[in-house]
Regions:
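Nucleotidyltransferase catalytic core that binds NTPs
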Residues: 1-140
Length: 140
């Protein structure tokens, strides 16, 4: 019997867009169990609870979790940034994570911190040139 491959994606999903869906679809196709962690801060313009609901509806076969503690968002914000995020992820996902999927540079370091493989998904944005910031600035 083979061990199921656990995949992991995290993001703000503010709002979920085609790039996020590409990433999650890519990840879902390369693991047996996918966990999506929706991270939010109280001060953000779209409530985290709503984003969690959206991602849960989009990915009913994934385990979609929500984390809403105020923690550093960039390594420059805290010398303990990677320790904080490693423990945060382990607190919500105590099972081993085998693969971390991301389109951003942080994915490699996060995978290393978790003892997982890094699987980059379209890092050059060749498949989906989408920005959540641009969507929030001009939603229609």
């Amino acid at each position: 019997m083979t061990t199921p491959v656990h995949g992991f994606v995290l993001g703000k999903f503010m709002p979920p867009h085609a790039g996020h869906m590409y990433l999650c679809d890519f990840a879902a196709g390369l693991c047996d169990q996918l966990t999506i962690l929706v991270c939010s801060l109280e001060r953000e313009p779209i409530p985290g609870k709503l984003r969690h609901e959206w991602m849960s509806a989009l990915y009913p076969d994934a385990r979609v979790l929500h984390f809403d503690r105020d923690v550093p968002q960039e390594p420059s914000e805290s010398p303990d940034f990677w320790d904080i995020w490693r423990e945060l992820v382990r607190s919500v996902h105590p099972e081993p994570i085998h693969r971390v999927f991301a389109s951003e540079d942080y994915g490699l370091r996060l995978a290393q911190e978790l003892g997982a493989e890094f699987w980059p998904a379209d890092p050059e944005r060749a498949c989906r040139l989408v920005s959540g910031t641009q969507i929030r600035q001009a939603p229609m």
